[in-house]
Each structure stands twice: as C-alpha cells, then as structure tokens.
Amino acid sequence: MAASARDVCPTPGAWVAVSDSGRSVRGSDAVTAELAQRRVVLLGESHDNAEHHRWQLHTIAALHARQPRLALGFEMFPRRVQPVLDQWSAGELTEEQFLARSDWTSVWGHDPQLYMPIFHFARMHRIPMIALNVERTLVRRVGREGWDAVPPAEREGVGEPASAPAPYP
C-alpha cells in the first residue's frame, strides 16, 4: 500500500527523525537546539531546488541564533577560491565580482540566485565561508591513477583517506 503524502512529508517546520526503531516527527526548536551542540552539521539539498535552499537558509539562521560561532562549508568551491570567499564575507565584493572571481560558472554552474540568500546571510553576519572542494583535475587524476599515485604536494592539502568502518567491505 502506498504511503500518503502526510505519512511521508512532515508539516512545514517539522523534522523527521529516522532511527532503527522507526520514524518520529520532531519540532524545529528541539532539533535546532540539538544541532547547535554539534561540531559539524551537514545540510544537503537538490542543487536546483529553491525550497531546499530556503530550508537550508532557515536552518542556518536558527543555528546561528543559538550558536553565533559558526562557519559554513561549501562543496562547490575549490580551495583555491578561499581568498574570494574571505573577501565576500568581509563585504569587499559585489555579487558580480564574487561570482566572477569564484569562477562560479565553471566550478558549479547551477543558478547562483538559489545560493545567494545563504551567501548574503553569511556576509551580513560575518560568518566564515569555507571552500571544501578540490579542483576537478585532481578528482579526475585520482580516479584515473589512484590516490597513491598523486604526490602529497599535489593533493591540495587533502590528507590520507580514513579507512572504511567495520560494517563496510
């Protein structure tokens, strides 16, 4: 029997907690209070979904209200553009300059207007923005040659990968 939308999607402002014992719906305040105690919180989205980005912004704002010492990491930016992110957060660049200098079109390419509200929030509150990615050439090289074939000096600061946890082959 197919699940109804009510069974799958919580009401706006609610979160679904999934565990071994099943699903439960939790209020935003309770979840935000718990998340604000964590060192790292990952907020995923479909890159082209405006609602997902709005949810991310609301979650970031709620976390910032509880934990102002916050930093935001972004998967789309290679580490080489970190100085641009720093300039943006410091209020030194226009949107156009930020998008051009971060090489937005080639490093990401999705509609920047989906992301700009989050970038503006970070800038408005002087929240550090962290470039988390590496250059595509490094990704392709590792795929082609393997991690061990890349000299440490050419790994863009990335350390040795951690071993897989026991449940994984």
Q: Which residue ranges define each predicted feature?
A:
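N- or domain-start disorder-to-order transition segments that initiate the globular core
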Residues: 1-38
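Short amphipathic alpha-helical segments and helix-helix/interface helices
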Residues: 32, 60-61, 116-119
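Surface-exposed patches in mature extracellular/periplasmic domains of secreted proteins
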Residues: 46-49, 73-75, 130-135
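Membrane-embedded segments
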Residues: 48-54, 58-64, 69-73, 79-90
